[in-house]
């Protein structure tokens, strides 16, 4: 407790750019950062326990739905608490996953604005946040029946070479083909060329 009080006091004093910071103060600031990181990790672990609890129930059951709802809410709270940190963005994507599993596709897609900006990021961790959200975006679009949009973004989005070797890339191709096949089924007889193109591309990517 005394260490934590000293850390808080030092952290406040160190905010003055004209003030020389001693080694002891630097050590205390390092300790503060470690304590904060450890606390955030413990928070995240607690949140994921809600998620894991759902696995003991039969998928689709009322108990499963209640557990996933609880997890989605916990992830959302964690996101708003740490939205400027990586862990907050990860929680936003996990919330999106929970909502998609519950069939709440519009609510899941509402999470996207918080993570889509990282598609062009050079930071591998932030890029992964976007990559994970992209897979969920496709699932949500297909789930709500917006097949045209799903096909459009699946065919236009470019993945890095490293991403192309991941299991998620295979899932993206599967979802792309799934959307193309479903969209082809909906096209009328006046759209034979479009239908043939969709079927051919689905066959190619599978």
What is each stretch, according to the model?
Residues 1-206:
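Acidic, polar-rich low-complexity tracts and alpha-helical solenoid repeat scaffolds
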């Amino acid at each position: 407790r005394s260490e934590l009080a000293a850390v808080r006091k030092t952290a406040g004093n160190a905010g003055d750019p004209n003030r020389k910071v001693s080694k002891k103060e630097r050590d205390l600031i390092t300790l503060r950062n470690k304590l904060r990181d450890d606390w955030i990790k413990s928070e995240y672990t607690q949140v994921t326990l809600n998620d894991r609890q759902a696995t003991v129930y039969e998928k689709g059951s009322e108990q499963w739905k209640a557990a996933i709802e609880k997890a989605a809410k916990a992830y959302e709270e964690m996101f708003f608490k740490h939205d400027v940190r990586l862990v907050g963005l990860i929680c936003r994507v996990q919330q999106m996953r929970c909502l998609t599993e519950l069939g709440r596709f519009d609510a899941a897609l509402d999470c996207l604005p918080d993570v889509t900006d990282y598609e062009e990021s050079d930071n591998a961790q932030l890029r992964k946040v976007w990559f994970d959200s992209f897979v969920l975006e496709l699932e949500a679009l297909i789930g709500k029946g917006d097949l045209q949009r799903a096909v459009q973004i699946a065919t236009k989005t470019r993945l890095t070479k490293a991403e192309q070797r991941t299991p998620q890339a295979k899932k993206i191709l599967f979802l792309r083909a799934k959307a193309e096949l479903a969209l082809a089924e909906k096209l009328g007889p006046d759209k034979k060329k479009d239908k043939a193109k969709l079927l051919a591309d689905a066959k190619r990517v599978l």
